[in-house]
From Swiss-Prot:
MF terms in GO: tRNA (guanine(37)-N1)-methyltransferase activity
Signal sequence interval, chain numbering: none
SUPFAM superfamilies per record: alpha/beta knot (SSF75217)
Protein's UniProt name: tRNA (guanine-N(1)-)-methyltransferase
E.C. code: 2.1.1.228
Gene: trmD
A Pfam family annotated for this UniProt entry: tRNA_m1G_MT
Catalytic activity: guanosine(37) in tRNA + S-adenosyl-L-methionine = N(1)-methylguanosine(37) in tRNA + S-adenosyl-L-homocysteine + H(+)
Origin species: Endomicrobium trichonymphae
Keywords attached to this entry: Cytoplasm, Methyltransferase, S-adenosyl-L-methionine, Transferase, tRNA processing
Assembly and oligomerization: Homodimer.
GO BP, sorted A to Z: tRNA N1-guanine methylation
Protein role: Specifically methylates guanosine-37 in various tRNAs.
Gene3D superfamilies recorded: 3.40.1280.10, tRNA(m1g37)methyltransferase, domain 2
Amino acid sequence: MKIDVLTIFPGMFKGPLTESLIGKAIEKEILKINIIDIRSFSKDKHKKVDDKSFGGGCGMVMKLEPLYDAIKSTGVKKKNSTYKNPYTKPYVIYMSPQGRILSDSIVKNLAKFKQLVIICGHYEGVDERTMNYVDEEISIGDYILTGGEIPAMVLIDSTARMLTGVVKEKSSVKNDSFYNNLLDYPHYTRPAVFKGYKIPEVLLSGDHKKISEWRVQESYKRTKERRPDLLKK
């Protein structure tokens, strides 16, 4: 998979994309991430990418021209261009608090695409006409951040985990919280007893069937207690 990230702060991505599983996925060439500086497409001598909002109001708005040129540089065609296989089209995402809340089902679908183009907004957001070139707006929660870079990192990390070869044990992904609309079951490691706190006896039984049943029960119990809304999906 190729991911193009359009941002005015490219330096923010240096650490998160070179460590852990994401860094290894890039080394294995499972994942290719291209950080594109939107300012490099500004025709202003000061590389300005924002301007005042028509109609007045506080805050600045990201200009359309440099955003358009940055988007086109990734190979994106018209928004409604047809492809024999829809997952071969570059899928353009704008990280926005007004978008759909990121979920496991969204991530699974995004992982099917060959190329994602992620736009990171700033200030009061982007010129609304940018939406003519965007396939979907995605949010990571009902709160406001200083920009779209951190949400973009969340999207990249969660999507990359779904790609074959990124997580060594595929079963680890399938047993994670939300994968089947259930939270994950409790995990324990050595020692079996710590300051009087013992792990459940069933985990020491060696009976894989009983262990599996216990995990399903605990997963359901935890979901019912903490996220009952997931059971309604």
